[in-house]
Amino acid sequence: MKKYVFICLTVCLALGVTKAKADTSSTVAVGDSMMVLSDIISKGLPVLYIQTVDSEEPTCDYVSAPAGCMGKSITNATKVPGRMIIYQHIGEIDSVLYDSGDYEKDVSGMTIKIRGNTSAYGTKKPYKIKLQKKQDLLFRGDEATYKDKDWLLLKYDYLLTLVGFKVNALLDLPWTPKFHFVSVVLNGNYKGLYMLCESVKRNPDCRINVDKNSGYIFECDPYWWNEDVYVNSLTAPSYNFTFKYPESDEILPEQLQYMQTVVTDYENSLNGPNYTDKIDVVTFAAWCLGHDIEGTQDSGGANRYYCKYDSTGTSKIQMPLLWDFDMAEHTSFSWSRSHIKHFQSLFDNENRTFVDEYVGLWRKMNKTFFSTISQFLNSFNSSSEGRALNASLVLDGLVSGYTPTDLEEHVQDRIIWYKSRYRWLNRQIDAMNPIGDINIDGAVNVSDIADLIDVLLGSARAYRYANDVDGDGVIGIQDVADLIDLLLN
């Protein structure tokens, strides 16, 4: 997909999206040095050149959590208007992919502000960009589907997000955000490497699809104390729930009351056998497995986004995507902290539907997972986008305070880590629900043969991944024979 997006940028140019050769002769401050803009563009990545009105810089105030809460965040983030041009070097020409025009509210231009919580405390800030006119800034060739006003600039993170979204896609979660590596120049100062990314929001065409009038996107949020509107968590008051849709200044009192009931019923259900009435088990299992694959060592910051399509009784709570990989690859030989802190009640529940789905998702992908990730990373490294990113690392190091290494080293670091993680995870999940453990008692023995026959006769519940001994997707008499062979051998 990354290669596809990068090629689309080139195709857009070939189809005449750009205008005449751009004037890129202006100078840009890169750390303590000065460079010509065209030299930055020549590295190959798109360059977001942002000039705000009167060269005003986005600012924010920093706040710490009140007593009894956790984390630190920002407030009073200024929304600064300006103009944004996206340049890219194609062939021998510096060309314009996009020009927002000068700022005119609801007509042209854009605004930029600092975003994030602890991520906003570093020298390199993450930003939110809001266009005054919708545009697909990734140029995927279908403007009607992908255009939007809201975009993010996430800090370069050594390919953690690249792999994280690949895992998201492999798990077939409802939405995988798309992004592109870019260089950013703000008011004549080179800010370094970023990921220009879709934001988490309602957009039924290309992001999260919930009903416009009765749908919800919400987050179990450790930074709830920095929001004006939230609903309470009864089981974990340090993690109340805040809203992405409707936005906090648009949500009505009756909607807030409804969502308090939804959240309370959801939390209460997790300790009993009827949780399947409240949650979409497939997406919950995929989300948890995703962070277990990633080895995420952050139970607070790894954003737990939820959505509910509408307010009908048949609409279950989903977990639509993985997000925030700052603490990925931090634990090679233990479960992710989210697994332990937020999902343990589902793993321990007498209703084994969640465990069955979790194990099944892994068994569907485990044989090819490591080779898929390795091939994906190596392909990215050799792609035109990978080469452009590699060429830009030296400049990023000048402003981000690190000694740049070759992209190949970043790629191999990821591959080595996932090889180790894969081995540990595979052993742990196999032990959790062994193939052939028909009665889910943690052991495979002769009683499982009788239980599997009961499953075939319809007198026992089919835990489909444990029961499907031969892995052909069908629970049948052949599985009985294979189970006998398994026990004999």
Language-model features: where?
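Middle-to-C-terminal accessory/interaction subdomains
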Residues: L45, E56-P58, G122, T242-P434
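Short, well-structured beta-strand/strand-turn elements
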Residues: L171-S183, T296
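Bacterial N-terminal signal peptides
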Residues: I7-G16
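Cellulosome-associated attachment modules in secreted, modular CAZymes
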Residues: D430-N489
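Conserved oxyanion/phosphate-binding beta-strand-loop segments in alpha/beta enzyme cores
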Residues: G82-K155
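Internal "kinase-insert"/substrate-recognition segments embedded within catalytic cores
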Residues: K130-D136, A144-Y158, D172-P177, N189-L289, ...
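Regulatory N- and C-terminal appendages and interdomain linkers associated
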Residues: C12, D23-V107, E385-P434
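Positively charged n-region of N-terminal signal peptides that target proteins for export
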Residues: M1-Y4
